[in-house]
């Protein structure tokens, strides 16, 4: 489900780095990797193609990805940090990484999860959205530019 909107989500992530200072970007399917340098050093289309080629193949492993994110960023996450996750929360019946997300949430200012699937699909099959949302400040359905605009406006209102 994320494959269909991954380009859109990566364009959003790329654009965030141009607007907000100190954005670190990570991508994953079965492994997590930092793509901040690619986003900083390459034009949009090249950076996105490299990211999809390098990190977008394989079954999603939220447990492994969130554990790796925690390992890599734990010393930098503090009460000023906003963690933004773009994904469908489908665990492929594996570990969804709730414990890692909980620890990251406890150290950060907030965790915002953007899920491209319709809410009616959440918590069906291998979706772990309900379980993972317990450690999120906000959870939103986000599949289009209109959704994204609405969410950004809401986040900005809550930040002021």
Give a label for each model feature.
Residues 1-7, 32, 90-93:
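Short acidic, Gly/Ser-rich segments with clustered Asp/Glu that frequently serve as metal-coordination loops
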Residues 16-38, 106-126:
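A short, conserved beta-to-alpha structural element at the edge of catalytic cores
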Residues 33-35, 39, 46-81, 118, ...:
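Von Willebrand factor
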Residues 102-160:
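Von Willebrand factor type A / integrin I
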Residues 10, 96-102:
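Charged helix-capping and loop-helix junction motifs
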Residues 93-95, 150-151:
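Extracytoplasmic/secreted cell-surface and envelope-processing proteins
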Residues 1-22:
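An amphipathic, basic-hydrophobic helix/alpha-beta surface used to engage anionic
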Residues 80-84, 110:
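Structural motif
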């Amino acid at each position: 489900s994320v494959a269909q909107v991954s380009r859109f989500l990566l364009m959003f992530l790329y654009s965030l780095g141009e607007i907000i200072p100190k954005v670190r970007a990570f991508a994953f399917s079965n492994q997590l990797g930092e793509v901040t340098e690619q986003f900083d050093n390459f034009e949009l289309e090249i950076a996105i193609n490299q990211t999809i080629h390098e990190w977008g193949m394989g079954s999603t492993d939220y447990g492994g990805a969130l554990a790796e994110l925690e390992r890599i960023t734990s010393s930098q996450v503090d009460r000023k940090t906003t963690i933004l996750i773009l994904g469908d929360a489908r665990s492929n019946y594996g570990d969804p990484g709730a414990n890692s997300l909980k620890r990251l949430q406890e150290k950060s200012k907030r965790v915002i999860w953007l899920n491209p699937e319709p809410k009616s699909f959440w918590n069906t099959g291998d979706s772990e959205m309900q379980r993972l949302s317990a450690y999120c400040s906000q959870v939103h359905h986000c599949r289009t530019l209109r959704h994204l605009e609405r969410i950004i406006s809401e986040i900005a209102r809550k930040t002021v």
